[in-house]
Amino acid sequence: MASQEKASMAGHMFDVVVIGGGISGLSAAKLLAEHETNVLVLEARDRVGGRTYTVRNKHVNYVDVGGAYVGPTQNRILRLSKELGLETYKVNVNERLVQYVKGKSYPFRGAFPPVWNPIAYLDYNNLWRTMDNMGKEIPADAPWEAPHAEEWDKMTMKDLIDKICWTKTARQFASLFVNINVTSEPHQVSALWFLWYVKQCGGTTRIFSITNGGQERKFVGGSGQVSERIMELLGDRVKLEHPVTYVDQSGDNIIVETLNHEHFECKYVISAIPPALTAKIHFKPELPSERNQLIQRLPMGAIIKCMMYYKEAFWKKKDYCGSMIIEDEEAPISITLDDSKPDGSLPAIMGFILARKADRLAKLHKEMRKKKICELYAKVLGSQEALQPVHYEEKNWCEEQYSGGCYTAYFPPGIMTQYGRVIRQPVGRIYFAGTETATRWSGYMEGAVEAGERAAREILNALGKVAEKDIWLQEPESKDVPAVEITHSFWERNLPSVGGLLKIIGFSTSITALWIVVYKFKLLTRS
C-alpha cells in the first residue's frame, strides 16, 4: 500500500512500464505509443540499445561494438530501421575470403570453405544436410513439440556432431560453427535448441552467409541509432539509469520500484531483458516455479568483439576481402569481417573472440589481446602490415552486468523440453519480450523487434485495442533487401554420407563375393 501511495503521489501512473531499453523494449514502447497507450521505459544503463552499442570517437567516427548485422528475411528490423530513416550497406565480400587451417591460408569464395578431400566432402555435405533436415522437424514457435524433442534435448551438440561426423576435419568445423553462431561450446548446448536456433534463422547456409545471409549488411551510422531514434520519438517516456529491482502485482495496479527507490504505477509490465537478468528483480507474488527455474538455467554466450584499424586496407592487395575463418586453437580470433566504412574509409577488420577463448583471453591486458590479434592477422593474411594498426577498439560483453554476455542466452541439455514452453508465457500482467522469446531470427536484432512488437500487441489485445488474431502478424518481405531462395544441387541432396558410402561398398563387396562363389560353384558342377 505504501508503494502504491508513493507512485500515485508522484504522478507516476502509466498503462505500461517496459523494463529494458534495448531494441526489443523500445520497439514495444514505440508500438504502444502509436496506439495512444501511456508507456514508460525504464533502462538500467546510461544509454539505450542493450546488446547493440555504437561507440563514437575521433578515431573511428562510429563503430558497432555490439549487435550489428542485418540481412534478407530479417524483414521487421529492415522495416523499422527504414521507418526511422536509417540506411544499410553491404559488408564487403568483393574479394576472396580466407580459411586458415593447420597453419596454412586458403582463399575461397562463397558461404563455406571448399573441401577437396572426397571423404571429407561427403562428411561436410552430410553434416549440413542432416542439420537442416532435423531442423525441418522442429516447429519454430514450439521446439519442445518436435517429434524427437525429448531425444534431441538430452544430447549436446558435441554428442550430435560426434554421431554425424566421421572425419576430424568435419567435427572441428562443426564445433567452430557452433562457436560462431551461438558464442558457446558444443558440449554446453542442447542439440534440440541449437537445431531450432539454426532452423529459425533460415538454415545452415542462411545463418552463416554474408551475401544473402545474416551478415550481409550493416547500418550506415551504426545499429545503435535504432534505439536512439526511438528514444527521441518517446522523449521523456524513457528513463535512463533506472534499474528495476521490485515488481509488485499483488494489488489493483502494478508497482515498479527502481534501485534509486522511485516508484511507478501501471496496469501492465513488459520485461524486455535477458531471461537470467530477471533474477535481479524481486517479484510479489513470487514467479511461478517453472518460470523461476527457467531463468536460473539460461546462461549467456561469451564474446569479446574486436575492431583493428589500419592506415589502408592492405589485405585487398592480395585480393582478400578481410573475412577470415580461422581454425586454430591457439588463435584468439575465430572469424573476421571487413569493418571499413561504406566508402572504404577507416579500413578495419572486425574479429570475434568466442566462447572458451573469450574466457581465456579476458584474463589478459587489452594491449596483449591487441598484440596477439595483430600477430594472427599477419600470419593468416601473409602481411607484416597487420602488425601496424593505427587504432584498436574492443568490447567484452561478459563484463556487462546488464547483459551478462552476448549474443544470446543458450539452452543447456534438458531445459527446452522441461521449461522452454514458458519462455514467453505471461505471468499475471507481466509480459515477456527480448530476442530470446522470438520465433524468427532469435538472437538477432530481428528477433528483438519481433518479440517486442508481439508483447506490445498482447497488451493491446488485453486493453481491447487489437484483435487476438492480430497478436502474431506475418511481416511482408522487404522490397529493399529481398531474399534469394537458397537451393541445393542434386548431388548435395543425394550424395551418401561416409557411413552410407561404406555400407554401399560393403554391400557391393558382398554381392561381388557371392557372385564369385556362385560362378565357381557352377564351374565345379559342370566339371
From Swiss-Prot:
Q: Where are the transmembrane segments?
A: 498-518
Locate the S-8alpha-FAD cysteine modifications and list their residues: C406
The protein's predominant localisation is: mitochondrion
* PTM sites of type N-acetylmethionine: M1
Please list the residue ranges that the record places on the Cytoplasmic side of the membrane. Answer: 1-497
**Site (Important for substrate specificity): residue numbering on this chain:** I335
Name the Gene3D superfamilies for this protein. Answer: 3.90.660.10, 6.10.250.130, FAD/NAD(P)-binding domain
List every stretch annotated Interaction with membrane phospholipid headgroups: 520-522
Q: Which domain of life is it from?
A: Eukaryota
* Annotated site, Important for catalytic activity, chain positions: C374
Keyword Metal-binding listed: no
Q: How does it sit in the membrane?
A: Single-pass type IV membrane protein
One GO BP annotation of this record: catecholamine metabolic process
One GO CC term on file: mitochondrion
- Where does this protein reside within or beyond the cell? Mitochondrion outer membrane
An example of a Pfam family matching this protein is Amino_oxidase
The EC number on file is: 1.4.3.21, 1.4.3.4
Query: Mind listing the GO molecular function terms for this protein?
Result: flavin adenine dinucleotide binding; monoamine oxidase activity; primary methylamine oxidase activity
**Mitochondrial intermembrane side of membrane:** 519-527
UniProtKB keywords: Acetylation, Catecholamine metabolism, FAD, Flavoprotein, Membrane, Mitochondrion, Mitochondrion outer membrane, Neurotransmitter degradation, Oxidoreductase, Phosphoprotein, Transmembrane, Transmembrane helix
**Which of the residues bear the PTM Phosphoserine?**
S383
What is stated as this protein's family in its record?
Belongs to the flavin monoamine oxidase family.
Its subunit composition reads: Monomer, homo- or heterodimer (containing two subunits of similar size). Each subunit contains a covalently bound flavin. Enzymatically active as monomer.
What's the protein here called?
Answer: Amine oxidase [flavin-containing] A
Give the source species.
Equus caballus (Horse)
